[in-house]
Amino acid sequence: YNTPSVEIAPSTKCIKSAKISLYYSIAFLEKLSMTQEEKYMKAAIREAKKAYALEEVPIGCVIVQNDRIIARGYNRRNTEGNTLAHAELTAIKKASKKTGDWRLEDCTMYVTLEPCQMCAGAIVQSRMKKVVIGSMNPKAGCAGSVLNLLQMAQFNHQVEIERGVLEEECSTMLSGFFRELRDKKKSLRENTQNA
């Protein structure tokens, strides 16, 4: 006795629903496999993208206390016309305001690019516990590249450092930004010469 088989074509709605479920399942699995450091560095990268959108050097930063982001910052130096408008300084100021204390001893900073001397000094002064860095800065970095101000024995506070978290993603964003900037300048020069 044979039962006739009937093929039922899935509806468009059913396919869309399956695709959405698959998308969220993949996103959930990616989050599960992500370390805490990667999770918070992703948040810093989102801040850096805000700077990128303003045509600023894409540097982003978050400060975490008790497994919660308490402050965020991104580079706005050109936008504000202010040398002090670095991502790290913005985040430190916000974190101090949020905690009601300039001492951020139980906080960790996640930053997409190795801090400069000014920001490294502020990190030490704020008594930050740890700094997690995405990409190193061989020209101006002061967490080991040019100097290591964060761990100088002569200072009354040293900061724990973790380097290279999502380094490729952070580096790619920075190199892409500078490539676009060079291309714009080249195009502008060529247009000026042809005018």
Regions found by a protein language model. Name each.
Residues 4-9, 18, 27:
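Short amphipathic, helix-prone segments within low-complexity/disordered or flexible regions
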Residues 24, 28-54, 102, 118-195:
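Zinc-dependent deaminase
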Residues 59-64:
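Short beta-strand scaffold segments in enzyme catalytic cores
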Residues 79-89:
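A short, polar/charged loop-to-alpha-helix boundary motif
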Residues 92-122:
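Helix-adjacent hinge/juxtasegments
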